[in-house]
Design a protein with these regions (language model features):
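Extended beta-strand/loop cores of jelly-roll/beta-sandwich
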Residues: 1-131
Length: 132
């Protein structure tokens, strides 16, 4: 970030930002209108992950999964945080905790399991853009 130093004044023009995150219902309208398929709903391609076992090339996403035992926030290996997240096959915006979950009663909650390109596609459809 060469333009961040030395400290200097910057003028930013006016802009609009939505009052809340995009909800499941709003994202659902976009998907229904366009037929869009999110990154989490698409299985990884073998050519993008050479040597990966075929059983690992399944659509899904990483889900916050608190461990049953106490885990330090930091450890010597620097990997303690990895115990809080798990790749769940079938997890997507439609199934936020995995294939057995759904959006029942979650229409007003923020959509999850959305990749950057998914957010860009939604913003373009909604006549908006992502903040930079």
């Amino acid at each position: 970030m060469r333009d961040a130093r030395p400290v200097h004044r910057v003028r930013v023009g006016g802009f609009w930002m939505d009052i809340h995150e995009v909800t499941n219902d709003e994202f659902g309208e976009f998907v229904e209108a366009t037929g869009y398929v999110t990154v989490a709903e698409q299985p990884p391609q073998a050519e993008d992950f050479p040597g990966a076992p075929p059983e690992n090339l399944v659509a899904g996403s990483i889900v916050f999964t608190p461990p049953s035992e106490e885990v330090p926030v930091r450890d010597a290996s620097g990997t303690a945080h990895l115990r809080w997240w798990a790749y769940v096959p079938g997890a997507s915006w439609r199934h936020p905790a995995g294939p057995a979950s759904d959006l029942e009663g979650r229409g007003d909650e923020p959509v999850v399991h959305v990749a950057y390109e998914d957010a860009e596609a939604y913003a373009a459809w909604a006549g908006k853009r992502l903040p930079s």
